[in-house]
Amino acid sequence: WRMVWEQNVSTVIMATNTEERKEPKCAKYWPSGDPQSYGDLMVVNLGENHLVDYTIRSFSVQRAQGDSTMSIKRNITQYHFTSWPDFGVPKSPSGILKFLRKIKHSSPTGYGPIVV
């Protein structure tokens, strides 16, 4: 989250699931319910939209600024592709193409790089 903050990132892409055949594959780095602190950054999950091939999550990342009443807040969107099979490739490219189109048309300009 510190890198996301430092680079002024607004879009994060996750191209793998957290498990493969019920074994851990990728750490779940975002909060589901209660806000989570990462150093001086507080991450709040604002919501999730589960679609057929991917999930879109919205987060608020807030950084304390000196006095605890002063803070800076940014919104981050995570696009998580969930239809890639544990082994092999998808039967059809349509899901990944829709995913990429959504990211292309939804990512705002004027921010830092997209993090994958």
UniProtKB/Swiss-Prot annotation:
Enzyme class: hydrolase
GO molecular function, one term: protein tyrosine phosphatase activity
KW Hydrolase (keyword) present: yes
Binding site for substrate: 86
Superkingdom of the organism of origin: Eukaryota
UniProt catalytic activity: O-phospho-L-tyrosyl-[protein] + H2O = L-tyrosyl-[protein] + phosphate
InterPro entries named in the record: Prot-tyrosine_phosphatase-like, Protein-Tyr_Phosphatase, PTP_cat
EC number, as in UniProt: 3.1.3.48
Alphabetical keyword list: Hydrolase, Protein phosphatase
Residues covered by the Tyrosine-protein phosphatase domain: 1-116
Family of this protein: Belongs to the protein-tyrosine phosphatase family.
Protein name, per record: Tyrosine-protein phosphatase 10
Upper taxonomic lineage: Eukaryota, Metazoa, Chordata, Tunicata, Ascidiacea
